[in-house]
Amino acid sequence: MKLAVRYGALVGVATGAWMFLEFLLGFHEPDTIGRWSGFLSLLFPLIASFFLVRHEPVRSWSLAFGQGAVFGAIGGLVGGLVIFCYFALLNPGFAMDGRTVDPTSQAIIGLVGALILGIMLVPIMRVFIKSRPAND
């Protein structure tokens, strides 16, 4: 599970760095490419889960789901902290669809979303790269 923690943290940092880069490039202004560029951040968990599955085998499907939960939870905690800092400190006036964004709710949504994504993504990635657990 060490790699699940490491790759989860890496995903959180990479996603946060991408969000800051989007801000610096002016993508978070209304009606810009920022409406779509955020979807590129979905590549970070895909790539990290691929390397996690390749380099840290598990013996059962239940452990694979656990590995996904750890991966997602750590990524969500790190990413949620970055999201909170972004909306609370760097861009507090950010508005989406005409309403300002609450930093705490955005961080919680990021954490829960990352946890769900991790639980689903790691076992699915195991199927695609044929790194199946031996039993269970």
State each model region's role.
Residues 69-85:
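Hydrophobic alpha-helical membrane-insertion segments
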Residues 81-100:
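Functional transmembrane-helix hotspots
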Residues 1-3, 126-136:
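Short, charged juxtamembrane terminal tails flanking transmembrane helices
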Residues 5-10, 66, 70, 104, ...:
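Internal alpha-helical transmembrane segments of multi-pass membrane proteins, especially GPCRs
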Residues 1-55:
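Transmembrane alpha-helical insertion/packing segments
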Residues 52-64:
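Membrane-helix interface/capping segments
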Residues 100-120:
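Hydrophobic alpha-helical transmembrane segments
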